[in-house]
């Protein structure tokens, strides 16, 4: 059915759509995260974003026409959580690489601001330090613990809470994220604003209702600091794995066999750094006493692995998709890394 979901009624087992109501026996909520640029005064009117297709095209064009005299480019994480923990760092490094390849090194400054204490904090201090070194090596200035308050488009300045403003000539922002209106109005969102689920089974508080992907809030058992809880990041690799687990569990319930499949919290990502180079981070996010995540050194293999993964993901079912899956699986086995295909 090609329709938009306009309401959820877990108590009655019904989904309201633009083409009428649909009753269900099992429901999988995979409505993702919405962008809310209007939550930051001045952001929507001033900032570019690469978190939408249209925004990415506009940002590309703005970079192509950036003044030859140079200037300052700011990449800003406006709030947490956000989709893909490595995306802001990749964006900053790729922007710096773009101008370096144009011979503009020294004319363009790239600054990355975030309210987080380090890059990818859920992965721990060792990985965070490694990513900061990657940023430094690519002339990206990293500004942690900068919580945005507003953007002054006329003055071309970012206002932060309790810190001096930062000037920019071009601003690329990761807007605040929130769950969809449908999820909130259905009472599925918890205190965090996202749908709380059982970490391993992805079940919600409602019978026969599951949630997967960016819409979920999944607490992690480990800690990096006493009393400071961690949440599973929002990333496609987790949504992919969770979807397969939920499908198996529902199939088991329908056929009357034991539902044994569980989500294990394993995840990975390729971290693009420019120059056709990337790092590879992977590990067990459910590990204790803290998530056990490893970052492999920069290499071309990780970059081309990401290109191959994208082609596999976008390919329609058929021989080409299967060939790409086999190539990915063999490459992952050769490199000694996990890969969800």
Language-model segment annotations:
Residues 78, 115-117, 214:
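Cofactor-binding loop segments of dinucleotide-utilizing enzymes, especially the Rossmann-like FAD-
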Residues 97, 235-265:
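Internal hydrophobic alpha-helix adjacent to the cofactor/substrate pocket in enzyme cavities
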Residues 43-69, 166-170, 174-241:
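FAD-site-proximal beta/loop scaffold in flavoenzymes
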Residues 72, 107-110, 208:
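Residues at the starts of beta-strands that form the adenosine-phosphate
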Residues 3-15, 96-197, 257-258:
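A Rossmann-like FAD-binding core segment of flavoenzymes
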Residues 1-103, 172:
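FAD-binding core/adjacent interface of flavoenzyme oxidoreductases
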Residues 154, 261-281:
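Flavin (FAD/FMN) cofactor-binding core of flavoprotein oxidoreductases
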Residues 279-341:
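C-terminal auxiliary extensions adjacent to catalytic cores
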């Amino acid at each position: 059915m090609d329709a938009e979901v306009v309401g959820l009624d877990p108590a009655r087992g019904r989904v309201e759509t633009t083409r009428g109501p649909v009753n269900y026996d099992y429901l999988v909520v995979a409505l993702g995260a919405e962008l809310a640029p209007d939550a930051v005064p001045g952001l929507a009117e001033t900032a570019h974003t690469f978190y939408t297709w249209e925004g990415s095209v506009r940002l590309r064009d703005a970079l192509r026409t950036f003044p030859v005299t140079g200037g300052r480019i700011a990449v800003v994480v406006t709030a947490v959580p956000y989709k893909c923990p490595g995306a802001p760092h990749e964006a900053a490094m790729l922007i710096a690489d773009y101008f370096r390849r144009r011979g503009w090194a020294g004319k363009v400054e790239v600054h990355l601001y975030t309210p987080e204490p380090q890059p990818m904090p859920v992965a721990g201090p060792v990985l965070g330090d490694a990513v900061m070194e990657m940023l430094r090596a690519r002339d990206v200035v990293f500004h942690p613990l900068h919580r945005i308050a507003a953007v002054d488009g006329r003055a071309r300045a970012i206002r932060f809470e309790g810190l001096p403003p930062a000037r920019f000539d071009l601003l690329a922002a990761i807007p605040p994220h929130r769950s969809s209106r449908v999820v909130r109005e259905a009472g599925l969102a918890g205190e965090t604003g996202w749908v709380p689920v059982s970490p391993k089974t992805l079940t919600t508080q409602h019978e026969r209702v599951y949630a997967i992907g960016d819409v979920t809030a999944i607490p992690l058992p480990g800690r990096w600091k006493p009393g400071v809880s961690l949440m599973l990041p929002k990333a496609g690799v987790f949504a992919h794995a969770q979807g397969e687990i939920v499908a198996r569990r529902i199939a088991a319930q329908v056929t009357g066999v034991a539902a044994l499949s569980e989500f294990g919290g394993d995840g990975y990502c390729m971290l693009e750094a420019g120059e056709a180079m990337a790092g590879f981070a992977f590990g067990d996010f459910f590990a204790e006493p803290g998530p056990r995540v490893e970052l492999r050194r920069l290499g071309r293999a990780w970059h081309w692995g990401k290109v191959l993964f994208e082609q596999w993901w976008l390919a329609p079912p058929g021989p080409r998709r299967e060939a790409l899956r086999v190539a990915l699986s063999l490459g992952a086995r050769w490199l000694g890394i996990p890969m969800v295909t």
